[in-house]
Amino acid sequence: MKRAVVVFSGGQDSTTCLVQALQQYDEVHCVTFDYGQRHRAEIDVARELALKLGARARKVLDVTLLNELAVSSLTRDSIPVPDYEPEADGIPNTFVPGRNILFLTLAAIYAYQVKAEAVITGVCETDFSGYPDCRDEFVKALNHAVSLGMAKDIRFETPLMWIDKAETWALADYYGKLDLVRNETLTCYNGIKGDGCGHCAACNLRANGLNHYLADKPTVMAAMKQKTGLR
């Protein structure tokens, strides 16, 4: 039996990854992280979506220690979420240092326990938000270290790594879940479901990608299929 663990926030990217994983694996487990995030409404959204879509298990892990260590506008109410990013040094204040290091490592431990062969994450370098822990070289390096440390070949999969936001919408549409992803996910840094606040960088990226896709569906769908190998 093929099993996978999806790092699942209930946002556009991870929901699209979950939709695809459910088509490719016999058993899919979701793991969601509570790190005291500003937009912690995503935890309830993730629970609801994982249940609705049919994930085998829906685990929420308490990693609020990260909140104490990582200072970010997503972990501190006193730091405002900016409308546009990145900042002058290239790293936006929404970056949570160490977040994906922790999430992927814990997801791999969970995968080890449930005998899953893959950990799936929705990080992406094409519409790169300036987060160093979304880069392909980082994911590959951590994957190698984790596999060595557990003496087990757990594969980190990044199905969105080389497609842009418009193509991510196309991928959701390919699986017949465009409306679900648009209306029922939570991507907004300010914790607003669906189309979100319309001002933060996450909402900007999401809306621009959707508008691009809706304006030229055939071209974007063809590009997505070419990059992902789907037919």
From Swiss-Prot:
Q: Name one GO biological process term.
A: queuosine biosynthetic process
The protein's GO terms of the molecular function aspect are:
ATP binding; ligase activity, forming carbon-nitrogen bonds; zinc ion binding
Q: Which domain of life is it from?
A: Bacteria
Question: What's the top EC group for this one?
Answer: ligase
**One Pfam family per UniProt:** QueC
Reactions catalysed according to its record: 7-carboxy-7-deazaguanine + NH4(+) + ATP = 7-cyano-7-deazaguanine + ADP + phosphate + H2O + H(+)
Q: Which UniProt keywords apply?
A: ATP-binding, Ligase, Metal-binding, Nucleotide-binding, Queuosine biosynthesis, Zinc
Q: Where along the chain is ATP bound?
A: F8, S9, G10, G11, Q12, D13, S14, T15, T16, C17, L18
- The residues that hold Zn(2+) are C188, C197, C200, C203
Cysteine disulfide partners in this protein: none
Q: Which coenzyme or cofactor does it need?
A: Zn(2+)
Pathway of action: Purine metabolism; 7-cyano-7-deazaguanine biosynthesis
Q: How is the cofactor bound?
A: Binds 1 zinc ion per subunit.
EC code(s) of this entry: 6.3.4.20
Its function, per the record, reads: Catalyzes the ATP-dependent conversion of 7-carboxy-7-deazaguanine (CDG) to 7-cyano-7-deazaguanine (preQ(0)).
Would you identify the family this protein belongs to, as annotated? Answer: Belongs to the QueC family.
Q: What is this protein called?
A: 7-cyano-7-deazaguanine synthase
Q: Which source organism does the UniProt entry give?
A: Escherichia coli (strain 55989 / EAEC)
Q: Which gene encodes it?
A: queC
